[in-house]
């Protein structure tokens, strides 16, 4: 048996087409163009690539998107002042500070300086708190876990009662992913580097989400027959003298036992960017007092 390879790119492209129509109608009906500002501190090549991809996608959809380029030497206080200016600008609906930031800057302080209504990454303490207290409809949810859940729902709509295992406990993916799965009435187990007998937990999973950052960490023998496997990892390795990207799952082997699996690249990555656009539209509508507009186009 080989699993159904779930193309995040194909699903994200479909979402993009839907969002383009939504934004066009938003402009026509409410004279509103959602605006996303990405703050990039320093000149890290990987961060520059991520930012270009986000801006390209925003422009494709008809969003207004700008990148604020700041030197790596900027002081923490100056960066905070820049964010306050964006918070106070009513034409700006979404603010994203590209991570990582230089070591002399407190990442958590910066995240929590962003107005939570404009925090399209969903990392602000207020958004996290609302998500973890069952107020998903009243907050901005982190993009990658949202994208993962959407992919899972393209495979099966009824998740209630499923055993779900999340490998990883980061604030960006692991914890919010577990919370979203709990919201779907899954029985959720979070495992991590200190978990004893980690493979045994994985073998119980109807849904297995790998977000640990270790190349090909999840082996064939760890996976239940027919499981849905979502691979969040993106790891650069060199193999036979060739650099390539691989996930946290041993794709070639696990694909033989899973009922559905996401590839790397082309799986979760495109979904993350798609849901950044979703969050920007939600933020723009919320700030403009427009209720339920996106839900007419996209079932979240």
Curated annotation (Swiss-Prot):
The entry's keywords: Amino-acid biosynthesis, Histidine biosynthesis, Hydrolase, Methionine biosynthesis, Multifunctional enzyme, NADP, One-carbon metabolism, Oxidoreductase, Purine biosynthesis
One MF term in the entry's GO annotations: methylenetetrahydrofolate dehydrogenase (NADP+) activity
Pfam families linked to this entry: THF_DHG_CYH (PF00763), THF_DHG_CYH_C (PF02882)
KW Amino-acid biosynthesis (keyword) present: yes
GO BP terms in the entry: L-histidine biosynthetic process; methionine biosynthetic process; purine nucleotide biosynthetic process; tetrahydrofolate interconversion
Assembly: Homodimer.
GO cellular component, one term: cytosol
Gene3D superfamilies with a match to the protein in the record: Leucine Dehydrogenase, chain A, domain 1 (3.40.50.10860), NAD(P)-binding Rossmann-like Domain (3.40.50.720)
Top-level taxon of the source organism: Bacteria
Protein name, per record: Bifunctional protein FolD
EC number(s) reported in the record: 1.5.1.5, 3.5.4.9
Pathways involved: One-carbon metabolism; tetrahydrofolate interconversion
Organism: Ehrlichia ruminantium (strain Welgevonden)
Family of the protein in this entry: Belongs to the tetrahydrofolate dehydrogenase/cyclohydrolase family.
Swiss-Prot/TrEMBL catalytic activity: (6R)-5,10-methylene-5,6,7,8-tetrahydrofolate + NADP(+) = (6R)-5,10-methenyltetrahydrofolate + NADPH; (6R)-5,10-methenyltetrahydrofolate + H2O = (6R)-10-formyltetrahydrofolate + H(+)
Annotated NADP(+) binding sites: 168-170, 193, 234
Annotated NCBIfam families: PRK14187.1, PRK14188.1
General function of this protein: Catalyzes the oxidation of 5,10-methylenetetrahydrofolate to 5,10-methenyltetrahydrofolate and then the hydrolysis of 5,10-methenyltetrahydrofolate to 10-formyltetrahydrofolate.
